[in-house]
Amino acid sequence: MKKNNPIALLPIGVFLVLYLGLGILFEYVMKIPMGFYNIPIIIAFLVAILVACLQNRSVSFDKKLELMASGLADKNIITMILIFLVAGAFVGVVGRSSAESVAFFMLALIPARFAVAVLFVVACFVSTAMGTSVGTITLLTPIALAVSAASGFDAPLCIGAIMGGAMFGDNLSFISDTTIAACNGQGCAMKDKFRENFKIALPAAIATLALILVLSFRSDLNGAVNESYNLIQIIPYVLVLIGGIMGINVFVVLLIGIVSGSFIMLATGQTAPTDLLANMGSGSAGMFETAMVAILVAAMCALIREYGGFGALLHAIHRVFKGRRGGQLGMGLLVGAMDIATANNTVAIVMANPIAKEMASEYGITPRKTASLLDIFSCVSQGVIPYGAQMLVALSAAAELGYEISALNIMTNLFYPGFLLVSVLIFIFLTPHREKR
């Protein structure tokens, strides 16, 4: 990493002004419907990368291209892109009718008022088992939208419920990339981090579920939704959900869904053999923008890191926060800032690990608590950025199924990260220091 240089963070500011600033201006000041869609996120990132390339003229353009390429050479980035594409193929194969059958079947078994609460709980379990919030959101978004259409609940509320549940599970799962990154970086056992994490995350999940139930009971929905459904078309989603709960690798789960979905759609005559591959292709194509965002973010962050932008951020946080509680809050803001900058909580944790470990040693904070705080605050940050992988994959899946939903609509219905922030702040400032080193 080069000498600390706060100016290197300018591309992030440029992106935020273009995407968030103009989006808010168009939608809420100029009252343009779906104003955020007038700001293509890829163009905003391209402008930000252009600004990054114009900085630091002591580095040649060819060298900058090499740096951006090195930023893409990361397992997490490749895994994320492949999940996007394979998940898109799954959505393309099973189509909207299969998701609707799942939703109608669920709503036939439970009162319509509890539909959103059930979505949240299911997402919690699936994400904990699968270890990926992105995979969980991809699998459950079509179901959430079908539940919305069948029950009358707003689509952003249903998507917000599954996103919150997915973040809860990803935050706790033993096989989550964020858990692995945090525990390896801080040198603690996963079971110890889980126990520390669970007592913070559980109250937030309970509060989220309670709020969803309150909103549900305030609605005028009564009884059950009685719509026809095809049990055979439910099979791909059942297999995928069972695979997720069993903790099977997300790629294996999605491939099972694609194979079973293809067979069922062909056998029932829902899809012609000549259309099957085309449907897969259109489904994956619906994820192209999401995959491109992941690529552009990785490239931009590689330049910022080389210029010393992240080093300056780390140094500033380390210098400002003093004392044990201040150290814990500083760790949280550190990884939160990294997450906002990179839009990838695993990358943010990896980047924050070295300075967080140093702060933990200085302030007497145990490795398990440090790992837990890094994972929790990165989760909170993912809930407040409209360009995170979780949000993008939800929007892409919704768009693929014909729904026009803005990130801000979902963010106002994404309750879990807010409750998690309150829970962790209470834990930091009101919990007495009793742990042993």
Question: What are the residue ranges of the model-derived segments?
Answer:
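Alpha-helical transmembrane segments of multi-pass membrane proteins
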Residues: I83, R113-V126, G152-G169, G326-D339, ...
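Hydrophobic mid-bilayer segments of alpha-helices in multi-pass membrane transport proteins
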Residues: I7-G21, G35-R57, I78-V86, A117, ...
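Juxtamembrane helix-boundary/capping and inter-helix hinge elements in multi-pass membrane proteins
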Residues: R57-F61, A73-K75, G152-P156, A181-F194, ...
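Membrane-interfacial loop-to-helix junctions in multi-pass transporters
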Residues: D74-M80, F104-V122, S148-C158, L202, ...
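Interfacial loop-to-helix junctions that mark the boundaries of transmembrane helices
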Residues: K2-N4, E27-I42, S70-K75, M106-P111, ...
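Hydrophobic alpha-helical transmembrane segments of multi-pass integral membrane proteins
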Residues: M80-V91, P111-I143, H318-E358, E362-Y363, ...
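Juxtamembrane and boundary regions of transmembrane helices in multi-pass small-molecule transporters
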Residues: K2-K3, G164-M167, N171-E227, I232, ...
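Core transmembrane alpha-helical segments of multi-pass membrane transporters/permeases
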Residues: N38-L46, L50-Q55, K64-S98, R113, ...
